Amino acid sequence: DYAASVNANLFVSIHLNSGGGHGAEVYYPNSNYRSDIGSEGKTLAQSVQDELIALGIYSRGIKIRNSQDSKYPDGSTQDYYAVIQRSKRAGFPGIIIEHAFIDSTNDFSAFLNSDEKLERLGKADATGILKYLGIGKGEWKQENNGWRYQYTSGEFAINKWEYIDGFWYFFDGNGYRQT
C-alpha cells in the first residue's frame, strides 16, 4: 500500500533464502489478471537475475508461485506472495529477490560473509533494475546536426536537462545538445 501511495513504478523485496538449497532466484507476477504486469515483472526479474548470475551465483531461475485458493477480481488464480499480488493490484510489477541461501556454507562464504560481498549483491540488484528501466550509462553520438546522448535503452535524451559524467547538459526537442 505504501508503494502505491508514493506512485511507485515497481516494488522490489530483498530476501535471503534458507531451507537447504543454494543459489539465487527471483519471483515475479503470473500472467493472470493484468498480464501486462506479469510480462513486465518477468522482464525485471530476468534483468536482476542476469546480474546476480554474473557474480557467479548458481541460478535457480526466475519463477512464479500461484496461490492454491485465492483469486483475482477476474476469477483467475492469484499470485501467492502478498507483495507481488498487491503490487499487481496497484498497477505495477512487484518482485522478490532471493539472493542466496543463508544456511548454505558455500553461498554464505562466497556471497554473504562480508560487507563487500553484500554490497556486490546490492549493486547487482541496482544494475538489473536500472537496465530494466532503461536508465544508466549511455553514450554520446555525433551526428551532422550536433551531439546527442543515447541511453542504454536506445532512446535519446530529449527536451530535458541531463547530468552526465559530472556535467549538466540540455537537450532540445530533437535530442541535440544545446549546452
Predicted segments, located by residue:
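Active-site-proximal helix/loop segments of hydrolytic enzymes
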Residues: 1-136
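Extracellular adhesion/carbohydrate-binding repeat motifs centered on closely spaced tryptophans
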Residues: 136-179
